[in-house]
């Protein structure tokens, strides 16, 4: 067994005769939670699910809570690394691909879907080499590096927003069923009296810029008739409470909101970042928003996400800079006193919603697996999975030979040998359709 893969001791399913769907996702909640939503749908249909993630990453804590077996790879991101680490990247990636192949041969998935993250790259490449039906779901309008690469040979490319890839299928981002089930904006907002309810979402880690800008902007408005509920993350809770106290603004400051459906139902307006999952929830709930994209987001993808809602008049976009508090004050001055505008934004958001995204993604996965909702053929009835024992022996021999040649060679030469070993040992899997259920990718 490769030291680059850590295999779960939990079997994929009580019956070894049922092939699972493998989910590749990790690193951030934006990748993990959509995967969990789809996993819930698949399992409700009787389809087992297995997960491939990265050692020590967020998915290793979240996924087991849902009783989903997870295997992990020793892999990290490449962006922002020093030159020495980047030079060694090809070797690490090839080893991770080989380790991922080991996991896939053990799990024998009927289909593999990438939601992005560190382990998704090696996992997706291994799926391609072994002929597994590979799909990609990209949550953001600006595609991540991993999904951008995998999209080149994926069977289907699914997106949360239109305009991410050529030939994409914009199915939306999965949201929790209780959020999608909220009444229409008119049923919630028309005829409301009392304070305007402003929901501020800083994400699980909090957003210091919102902790500072929102109290400052509200204080500058001269204490309007507003009720504030601010989700700030555990680490920044004290900081947020101090900011509101200094601004003499009453607010309920919470590190975490468990019932987001109730929070959206309560809100007249939301001030938040522009992560893909958050925007999908805003649309599903039908609530207007003021979006402040995270300035350091990779490829500025949050701004691209926000522009989609702004283009539909469902949100206002404010850039994160030194003048944010002043501009937020100006925007709030208009929105807090204009219920018709808030309702219009909420209705516009609701028209963008795709509440059945998780169901549609599950449908497409099973279509590409060639199984629909039917139970797949037994593993032993299929004509070969991945590579046979003889090929595996050959691969291991070649790998040992390559390992013996590492000493004294440059990183590039070592990576070249690894690539040659990997591709030679999997050539039959690439050229022969049907090694996985559903055929080659």
UniProtKB/Swiss-Prot annotation:
Keywords: Cell cycle, Cell division, Cell inner membrane, Cell membrane, Cell shape, Cell wall biogenesis/degradation, Glycosyltransferase, Membrane, Peptidoglycan synthesis, Transferase. It is found in: Cell inner membrane. The keyword Heme does not apply. The keyword Cell inner membrane applies. It comes from the Bacteria. One of its GO terms (cellular component) is plasma membrane. Disulfide bonds: none annotated. It catalyses: di-trans,octa-cis-undecaprenyl diphospho-N-acetyl-alpha-D-muramoyl-L-alanyl-D-glutamyl-meso-2,6-diaminopimeloyl-D-alanyl-D-alanine + UDP-N-acetyl-alpha-D-glucosamine = di-trans,octa-cis-undecaprenyl diphospho-[N-acetyl-alpha-D-glucosaminyl-(1->4)]-N-acetyl-alpha-D-muramoyl-L-alanyl-D-glutamyl-meso-2,6-diaminopimeloyl-D-alanyl-D-alanine + UDP + H(+). Its main location: membrane. It is an enzyme of class 2 (transferase). It is a peripheral membrane protein. InterPro entries: GlcNAc_MurG, Glyco_trans_28_C, GlycoTrans_28_N. Its EC number is 2.4.1.227. One of its GO terms (molecular function) is UDP-N-acetyl-D-glucosamine:N-acetylmuramoyl-L-alanyl-D-glutamyl-meso-2,6-diaminopimelyl-D-alanyl-D-alanine-diphosphoundecaprenol 4-beta-N-acetylglucosaminlytransferase activity. UDP-N-acetyl-alpha-D-glucosamine binds at residues 28-30, 140, 176, 204, 257, 302. Pathway: Cell wall biogenesis; peptidoglycan biosynthesis. CDD domains: GT28_MurG. GO terms for biological process: carbohydrate metabolic process; cell division; cell wall organization; lipid glycosylation; peptidoglycan biosynthetic process; regulation of cell shape. Belongs to the glycosyltransferase 28 family. MurG subfamily. Cell wall formation. Catalyzes the transfer of a GlcNAc subunit on undecaprenyl-pyrophosphoryl-MurNAc-pentapeptide (lipid intermediate I) to form undecaprenyl-pyrophosphoryl-MurNAc-(pentapeptide)GlcNAc (lipid intermediate II). This is UDP-N-acetylglucosamine--N-acetylmuramyl-(pentapeptide) pyrophosphoryl-undecaprenol N-acetylglucosamine transferase. It comes from Xanthomonas oryzae pv. oryzae (strain KACC10331 / KXO85). The lineage of its organism: Bacteria, Pseudomonadati, Pseudomonadota, Gammaproteobacteria, Lysobacterales. The gene is murG.
